[in-house]
Amino acid sequence: MPCVQLPAKESALFKRVLKCYEQKQYKNGLKFCKMILSNPKFAEHGETLAMKGLILNCLGKREEAYEFVRKGLRSDVRSHVCWHVYGLLQRSDKKYDEAIKCYRNALKLDKDNLQILRDLSLLQIQMRDLEGYRETRYQLLQLRPTQRASWIGYAIAYHLLKDYDTALKLLEEFRQTQQVPPNKIAYEYSELLLYQNQVMREANLFQESLEHIETYEKLICDKLLVEEIKGEMLLKLGRLKEASEVFRNLIDWNAENWCYYEGLEKALQLRSLDERLQLYEEVSKQHPRAVSPRRLPLSFAPGKKFRELMDKFLRPNFSKGCPPLFTTLKSLYCDTEKVSIIQELVTNYEASLKMNGYFSPYENGEKEPPTTLIWVQYFLAQHYDKLGQYFLALEYINAVIASTPTLIELFYMKAKIYKHMGNLKEAAQWMDEAQSLDTADRFINSKCAKYMLRANMIKEAEEMCSRFTREGTSAMENLNEMQCMWFETECISAYQRLGRYGDALKKCHEVERHFLEITDDQFDFHTYCMRKMTLRAYVGLLRLEDALRRHTFYFKAARSAIEIYLKLHDNPLTNDSKQQDIDSENLSAKEMKKMLSKQRRAQKKAKVEEERKHTERERQQKNQKKKREEEEEVTSGHKEELIPEKLERVDNPLEEAIKFLTPLKTLAAESIDTHLLAFEIYFRKGKFLLMLQSVKRAFAIESNNPWLHECLIKFSKSVSNHSNLPDIVSKVLAQEMKKIFVNKDLHSFNEDFLRHNATSLQHLLAGAKMMYFLDKSRQEKAIATATRLDETIKNKNVKTLIKVSEALLDGSFGNCSSQYEEYRKTCHSLLPLTPAFLPAAREALGLSAELNHTADHKLLMNEI
């Protein structure tokens, strides 16, 4: 329909509608819309209908909003306002591609509309359509050449496209238009100069960057950054003498920054050990209170010199009582010689302090305070824990606790030792003891909650966190609102271990939503950062958002989700009794009765908990409704409720798994787990070329990985079992597999793997599994290989030993209950306090293995 022109009265009302929308006076806006539309002549006025829809959307009436906007668009399809409003509606629903189409249609009708161009540019940078963003910013620059944002936005577009020369020309041209009072530092001008310099450095214009920073040094606020840039550029240009002076000045400013020492060493071109030691000795004399010049030489000093420096480093720290001392030195523990020297020094301190109160029996003068011995023994507990000598570590920590039962760090350390031993329940109890000494300490509270979750004590962990969450709401919901992802990822693992897959998936999807929210949250910064001239931070934000799902929290949640979906694909949950069938398969009548009684109690408890949650939900909904009424505004696009029962009964688990996998393949491609998880999905889908792609990528990262070895053999076996593959696919598979298997049959390939990794328990386990997989008659040989625990075997830690135990119970070696019992006894003799190897642990471990046996067999172990 043709555009209907409003007369003066209605036109004035329409302007008031626009004003009410801008000022968020939505009820008044609707009232004015009604006044226009109530006139029969203008009942179909497109722009008014569209604005009414936009206002309704702001009030949370999404369906009505779309109805009115579409009606308005049908009434006046040639109106740029209608298309613009439709775009705003799509944008509010996060349908950015559709919104861009609407804006482009609007611009066809009004190509110079500033507001539409601005909105379009925001969506283009949000979607990283950099070419389109550059064109739109160019149009804005032509229309508003006097506005700062026009120049800055256009320059940033070229910077992001890596056209540094054009970006620098634009920035310089804009800088010359800025009038800055002489001898006065303006923050925004300072940020512009620093951004300009950043572009120069990224363009490898080191000489220009140095000249630029020296020219405008007095106009820049961040003096420290100026010096850091100078030092970096002088190093790049080979002007080493000047660079060394800059880095010496930086060390005078901050003697604890390790990067400055690295820069100084490069500038001085120190080659010999003596020169390096002399440098740190000089700096240490100039800055006697600084730790870094005394700590850094410990990383490269050898033998006798290391002993001397370590002795000087340890004594003052023990005397004054420095809890993080061991953390400072932990990186040295990859060198066995240095570990031996540390152990000898500290044990000698302990013996001498006990005997005469000095660090050495040959000293005299003022004795060390009694607390020195406490810190020495605390250090020894950490030292032996790091070496895996848990009983010795417990001896020391118990001795210190007996003498000083009020020191939080001691209980914290004791909990840590039990965690490393695999006794997670005991670890949680001792961490609870630690937090009881200072209930106002948020760090120790969080640690306690984390340990409880590791011990599958989910309710207790929630109660622990509730001390620091908002009153009136459940801790779990409040932590979700606060995007507390460390808690949620730990919950995921706990639910997964307990076989509560629906709850685990709910948390996985909540973490996924957090990352979506973080991505959406950048929208407001596209205009804010240009207005405030925080350009370096803005570019940093854009780059962070591009790689957001590389974050460890997302990786953990995605990996767990994929593992659960694989499990659900292999063993679909058809009804509520399915899990009971799995649990009760091998139970006697007495055990069955006990289990049913336990289930009844659990159901009763769950019912009470559900009623509590229902009441809490109702109260929350009332509060939210009240809040909506007060604000007269509700965010549109309600999120779908995550119901655990629905999540664990999806129609196609593998497709759901792929949704979590896709970001990992792009952003976490350097992790072998990404490609092996991809293999497990494609293996179940029968996608041979994608399976090949996954194992090839994994092989390029770590060819000797135990999990990869299992995947390769399963892949090869699957290919040989499918003789009906297309010729071209078979040819490609044969050609590529030849490069990996080097013309060996699977048995020979597996034997070679076992021979080359004869001292690694993880590799022996993988090889033994594949031995049984390829030939069921070799069960005894396979079990003997996996359960080897002689002196030559490395990594005999709790993590790996439990892995072997689970493999003996989950069917990887068939039925082998007698061999499991024998292996359990052997492990129990090695680690008597680890619950997994106690005589009564078989049933629990067996259930755990059944519930948690996933594609990578690593879940429980990662928590220890």
UniProtKB/Swiss-Prot annotation:
Keyword Repeat: yes
Transmembrane recorded as keyword: no
TPR repeats: 46-79, 80-113, 148-184, 224-257, 374-407, 408-441, 485-514
UniProt-listed SMART domains: TPR
GO cellular-component term (any): cytosol
One annotated GO biological process: protein stabilization
Keywords: Repeat, TPR repeat
A Pfam family it matches: NatA_aux_su
Tissue specificity field: Highest levels in the kidney and testes. Moderate expression in the liver, thymus and skin.
Biased composition (Basic residues): 595-605
GO molecular function: ribosome binding
Positions of region (Disordered): 594-646
Ranges of biased composition (kind: Basic and acidic residues): 606-621, 635-646
Function description: Auxillary subunit of the N-terminal acetyltransferase A (NatA) complex which displays alpha (N-terminal) acetyltransferase activity.
Quaternary structure, from the entry: Component of the N-terminal acetyltransferase A (NatA) complex composed of NAA10 and NAA16.
Protein name per its UniProtKB record: N-alpha-acetyltransferase 16, NatA auxiliary subunit
